[in-house]
């Protein structure tokens, strides 16, 4: 839904609404600094008006979470989706949300149909009930800059499950989630099933026992639709890889090319914050294509290239540079296009000369493998993911990368010729993990929203209140290891849960 339906609300927060200025800074420079507002217990009340205003005026909202763990990885990849849902529910009931990222994107029609004002928040949370925290999750989060001392000292307290009395008027994370529902904006996530289950259990109500009831509840909670950027990247945009950092950087690069060519492109603006808030603002830098050129002497880490995660972390001797990975993928794709053109030319030549050798005999080299079609390979890769041999990233959804994605990337690599192999060596980075510091719920939410906005732009689709934003991605949630998504719909055999009905009365009875 477009944000301009709230004409009575000022477009940008004012200093009185949480200390945010009306001035904005364009994000069209070579190095874009994305301001992420850190929200903790000591400034939650101060930032509260800005949070509400950002939600109410947003065209869509992207959400991301950092979790204390995920439980048994193998159960999370169960082929039975109902059993998989139960496994995620168990994790949500026993683990907690450590931080919540919100990125509110507001369309600015007066500055162009593809112009957005982005406001990004990173909320540090502390569940007041007992919960499990997994050592691997702690290790992963600490490697990426998560401060557990700050979380325990300044985390915003919350409780899980159903409400305890009337909480609708309090300034709490649970009330904030209710305001997100009241906003009736499209909700955007990345690999969103686990996020949705954790959000429901931690900030909304006790989870329903079956998946059908859960999806029925979601339909009423988010009538403008739920969008999953991992599904959009893998099945709609057809990116070689679909983990978040790859999809974001790919969209950034393509958007930069369109801007340079004078074609329609995304234009972002961010709020300018006063110096008094400098202690609560964390600026994250995004590099435009061509701004960062390193000497390239080491190889690319295959595991990071495929999954966006490497078990060696910062100690990995190979490159985790996303730009190098994308450069290599694009070189492989160009090589495949050249092969295809040669094959078509040879086919036309053979057709014009009856009696000559067949096409199969004329092909120089083995046939290209089919991508994502080998069921045996799929099964093997799923088993590897389940056993933690690949992509077992703790505390994050991104580790559960589909076997299809890995098979795709391996097949692409096998098609590279000698020239492409040389490119792999020559384009490696001396800086092994340049992107590792980016991983945070707030910035991840921003990247998620950016990917969705770009995919919509690339398809020539615009947000409107009367119909789904991207029909092919509307209410489709990515399922690891599956070729079909989870469709969020209300079945004639499923009714919304009682706890959900009570929350709906609370949401709309007091609005």
Swiss-Prot record:
PANTHER family: POLY A -SPECIFIC RIBONUCLEASE/TARGET OF EGR1, MEMBER 1 (PTHR15092), TARGET OF EGR1 PROTEIN 1 (PTHR15092:SF37)
Annotated family: Belongs to the CAF1 family.
Entry keyword annotation includes Phosphoprotein: yes
Source species taxonomy: Eukaryota, Metazoa, Chordata, Craniata, Vertebrata
InterPro entries from the UniProt entry: CAF1_poly(A)_ribonucleases, RNase_CAF1, RNaseH-like_sf, RNaseH_sf, Znf_CCCH
Name of the protein this chain belongs to: Target of EGR1 protein 1
Name of encoding gene: Toe1
Gene Ontology biological process terms in this record: snRNA 3'-end processing
GO molecular function, one term: zinc ion binding
């Amino acid at each position: 839904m477009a944000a301009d339906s709230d004409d009575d609300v000022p477009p940008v927060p004012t200093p009185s609404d949480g200390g945010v200025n009306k001035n904005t800074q364009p994000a069209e420079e070579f190095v874009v600094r994305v301001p992420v507002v850190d929200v903790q217990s000591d400034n939650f009340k101060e930032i509260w008006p800005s949070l509400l205003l950002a939600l109410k005026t947003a065209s869509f909202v992207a959400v991301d979470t950092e979790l204390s763990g995920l439980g048994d990885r193998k159960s999370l990849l169960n082929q039975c989706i109902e059993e998989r849902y139960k496994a995620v529910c168990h994790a949500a009931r026993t683990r907690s949300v450590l931080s919540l990222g919100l990125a509110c994107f507001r369309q600015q029609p007066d500055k162009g149909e593809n112009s957005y004002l982005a406001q990004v928040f990173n909320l540090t949370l502390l569940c007041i009930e007992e919960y499990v925290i997994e050592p691997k999750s702690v290790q992963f989060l600490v490697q990426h800059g998560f401060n557990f001392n700050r979380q325990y000292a300044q985390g915003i307290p919350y409780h899980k499950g159903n409400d305890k009395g009337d909480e609708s008027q309090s300034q709490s994370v649970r009330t904030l989630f209710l305001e997100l529902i009241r906003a009736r904006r499209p909700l955007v996530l990345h690999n969103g099933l686990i996020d949705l289950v954790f959000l429901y259990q931690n900030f909304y109500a006790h989870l329903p026992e079956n998946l059908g009831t859960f999806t029925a509840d979601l339909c009423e909670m988010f009538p403008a639709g739920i969008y999953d950027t991992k599904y959009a990247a893998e099945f709609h945009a057809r990116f070689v890889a679909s983990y978040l950092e790859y999809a974001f950087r790919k969209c950034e690069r393509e958007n930069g090319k369109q801007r340079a060519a004078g074609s329609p492109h995304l234009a972002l603006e961010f709020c300018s914050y006063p110096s008094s808030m400098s202690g609560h603002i964390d600026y994250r830098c995004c590099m435009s294509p061509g701004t960062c050129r390193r000497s390239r002497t080491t190889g690319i880490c295959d595991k990071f290239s495929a999954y966006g995660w490497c078990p060696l972390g910062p100690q990995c001797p190979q490159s985790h540079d996303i730009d190098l990975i994308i450069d290599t993928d694009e070189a492989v794709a160009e090589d495949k296009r050249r092969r295809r053109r040669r094959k078509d030319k040879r086919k036309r030549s053979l057709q014009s000369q009856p009696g000559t050798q067949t096409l199969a005999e004329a092909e120089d080299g083995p046939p290209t493998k089919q991508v994502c079609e080998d069921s045996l390979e799929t099964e093997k890769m799923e088993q590897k993911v389940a056993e933690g041999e690949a992509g077992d990233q703790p505390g994050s959804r991104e580790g559960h990368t589909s076997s299809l994605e890995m098979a795709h990337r391996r097949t692409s690599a096998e098609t590279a010729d000698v020239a492409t192999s040389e490119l792999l060596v020559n384009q490696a980075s001396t800086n092994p993990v340049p992107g590792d510091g980016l991983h945070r719920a707030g910035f991840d939410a921003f990247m998620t929203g950016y990917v969705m906005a770009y995919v919509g732009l690339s398809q020539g689709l615009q947000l409107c209140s009367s119909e789904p934003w991207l029909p092919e991605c509307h209410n489709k949630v990515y399922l690891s290891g599956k070729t079909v998504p989870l469709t969020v719909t209300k079945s004639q055999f499923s009714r919304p849960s009682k706890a959900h009905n009570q929350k709906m009365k609370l949401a709309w009875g007091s609005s």
